[in-house]
C-alpha cells in the first residue's frame, strides 16, 4: 500500500506500507539524501518473515512534499510522530539509517519514545557527524560545508562523488545509477538544508533518554559516519548492542543485506 499523510497544510509525507497485516511493525527512516527505496532489500525479505515494513520519505526527499523551510531534527522528528499517530502504531520497532538514525534518536528524546518497543540504528549520524571540542570522532565541519556547496552548485556531480564514498564494496554501474536517481528525487534545497542540520546539530543530550533495547549496526569502513560514532552510541545508550559490519561502508543496508536482515529479525524476535 502507498499513501500520503499530511503533516502540515501543504506538506504531505509519502508512506509505503508492505504487509500491513504483519505480526510486528518496523518503521524505517532513510538516510541522507535517499528515500524509502534505500530499504528495497529489506522489504524484499522481512515481510516473508511476518513483519510489516513501513517506509517513510522524509520531507524534502523521495515522493514527499519538498517545502522551503525548516529541516532540523525537531521538525523531522515531529513529522515521524504525526505518522505514528495517523497510522496508530503501537509497540513498533523504529529503524533509522544515517540521518534517519539521528532523527530516530531525537524522536525517542523529544516524544519519549512514543509507541517504540525497540530501536535499531544503522550507520547512524549520531551523536555528531562532525568534530567538536572534546569530540574528535567525526569528520571536519569543512568537509560537510563542501558537500553543501556542491549540493547547491553541481548536485549531480556531488551525488556521483558521494556514491564512491558511500559504499565499501564494488557496485555495478546499474546499481550506482539506481543510487544516483534515488538521491536526485530530493530537492536541492532540502539536500543542502539537511546537510546543514547534521553538520551543526548534535544529539549528546538525547542519548540518555533512549529507554528501549537498541541494536547498533555500523560498517567499519564507513567514510561518512565514522565507526567510532557507533562506539560512542554503544557507550552512551543503556541496553544497547553494537554489531560491526566488517565488509560495509555507509551502505550496509545493501552491502551486507543478508546479515543485516538476519540480525534485525533476531533482535526483533
Model-derived regions, located:
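Acidic catalytic loop of the alpha/beta-hydrolase fold
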Residues: 221-225
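Flexible "cap/lid" loop of the alpha/beta hydrolase fold
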Residues: 105-110, 114-153
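Conserved alpha/beta-hydrolase catalytic His-Asp/Glu region
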Residues: 130, 134-139, 149-208
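Conserved HGGG/HGGXW glycine-rich cap/lid loop of the alpha/beta-hydrolase fold
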Residues: 14-69
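Alpha/beta-hydrolase fold catalytic core
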Residues: 1-27, 48-51, 85, 90, ...
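Short beta-strand/loop motif that positions the catalytic acidic residue
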Residues: 210, 216-218
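Conserved acidic catalytic loop of the alpha/beta-hydrolase fold
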Residues: 75-92
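Catalytic active-site module of serine/aspartate enzymes centered on a nucleophile-bearing elbow/loop
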Residues: 240-269
